[in-house]
């Protein structure tokens, strides 16, 4: 497992454990939102298409501004999952080669508390 994947596994474990410790329902499906960014809109769009083909629902890209004023484009890819560490990590492992292919940065994932 690459260092990046070890870091994403550790972060995923922490997020899932914190949600469950706060009382989030382990039996429900959650909208897992994966976040992406790239300064090249065309490359970002190509990654979004590939992620859609891989089974993720993708949002429209948004343009934002970095601290130095440079533009950056962002979007999310969402999929319904239980709060299962192995499943979420497997999704990340599936996405990383697509992102590397297009030079898109992965900015982690999140979801919302559910009782």
From Swiss-Prot:
<dbReference type="InterPro" id="IPR036701">
    <property type="entry name" value="RraB-like_sf"/>
</dbReference>
<comment type="function">
    <text>Globally modulates RNA abundance by binding to RNase E (Rne) and regulating its endonucleolytic activity. Can modulate Rne action in a substrate-dependent manner by altering the composition of the degradosome.</text>
</comment>
<comment type="similarity">
    <text>Belongs to the RraB family.</text>
</comment>
<dbReference type="InterPro" id="IPR009671">
    <property type="entry name" value="RraB_dom"/>
</dbReference>
<dbReference type="GO" id="GO:0005737">
    <property type="term" value="C:cytoplasm"/>
</dbReference>
<dbReference type="InterPro" id="IPR016716">
    <property type="entry name" value="RraB"/>
</dbReference>
<protein>
    <recommendedName>
        <fullName>Regulator of ribonuclease activity B</fullName>
    </recommendedName>
</protein>
<keyword id="KW-0963">Cytoplasm</keyword>
<dbReference type="Pfam" id="PF06877">
    <property type="entry name" value="RraB"/>
</dbReference>
<dbReference type="GO" id="GO:0060698">
    <property type="term" value="F:endoribonuclease inhibitor activity"/>
</dbReference>
<dbReference type="GO" id="GO:0019899">
    <property type="term" value="F:enzyme binding"/>
</dbReference>
<comment type="subunit">
    <text>Interacts with the C-terminal region of Rne.</text>
</comment>
